[in-house]
Amino acid sequence: MAKMRSLCAPASGDYRLTMRIALFQPEIAGNVGAVMRLGACFGVAVDLVEPMGFAWDDKRVRRSAMDYIDHVEVQRHAGFDAFRSTIGDARIVLMTTKAAASLYDFAFRADDVLLFGMEGAGVPAAVADAADAAIKIPLRPQVRSFNLATSAAIALGEALRQTGTLP
């Protein structure tokens, strides 16, 4: 099993070149592992904004990420401000059930950072206010939300399709 790394630097050394997925204080290790696998498959880096609701060396992350962990760039940040300081002028696009606009009506850019909140609570108001845009995945009114990793896959797939950057 590969060792889990805190930071896997891109070959260019520049984290602002391409789209990224950011998870704000994720609570479930399996979701983080699944998003890391998603990042590996699509060639998109993953940012983890701490604190997380589990130990970084949690076996559940490894089990979900499998050997894909060696194929994804992962950067951990001590908090939201630390995260923001690393993304330069990239636009933060918050994925939230509270948004009015649909991701299918939104114009993504190739260097957007797709931000996802905590599984149980989303993001605090200050983080939502700091986002450049807030959008949602439309779903039936009888249900609350998708799983975090499922949401990331839907949103990232649409964003990459729109920007012509699918692998």
Each language-model region and where it sits:
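Post-transcriptional modification and biogenesis factors for structured RNAs
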Residues: 1-167
